[in-house]
């Protein structure tokens, strides 16, 4: 199921997102039902809206996201999120992220402490990546990997 909240106003987006996240978490915690999938992917675009590094600790949505980031994997909940500025995300959410994909960003962003462990050559690459090109980081990989997704078939030919 996909729930697109892009056309809703900010408060309604927060309400819908928080309600859906809580419902998924509660369903997985209950665990008595056989009709619930083993894995549920919660995809969040612009994660800083809900798990900002400066969000108040009392934020119910932040608490839910921290629960999902910290305990969700053991329940079969996978948090997949996209954010242009990694430094804007809450530290505990970032700390529980295994795989990270870095797209093009600016020099100001890569100069922040979040990027200190990334070699300078990759930081420089991040400021010049093309659309569809990413740098992948995962603990299972010995070094960062540069990945380039091909253009869609309909865009590969000049007349087609």
Task: List where the protein language model places each region.
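Charge-patterned, long linear interaction tracts outside catalytic cores
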Residues: 150-160
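P-loop NTPase motor domains
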Residues: 1-67, 74, 134-140
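Conserved ATP-driven motor cores of ASCE-family P-loop NTPases powering translocation/secretion/packaging/pilus
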Residues: 60-62, 66-150
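Short, solvent-exposed amphipathic alpha-helical segments in soluble enzyme
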Residues: 17-21, 117-118, 152-153
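Short helix/loop capping segments that flank catalytic or ligand/cofactor-binding pockets
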Residues: 11-13, 144-147, 157
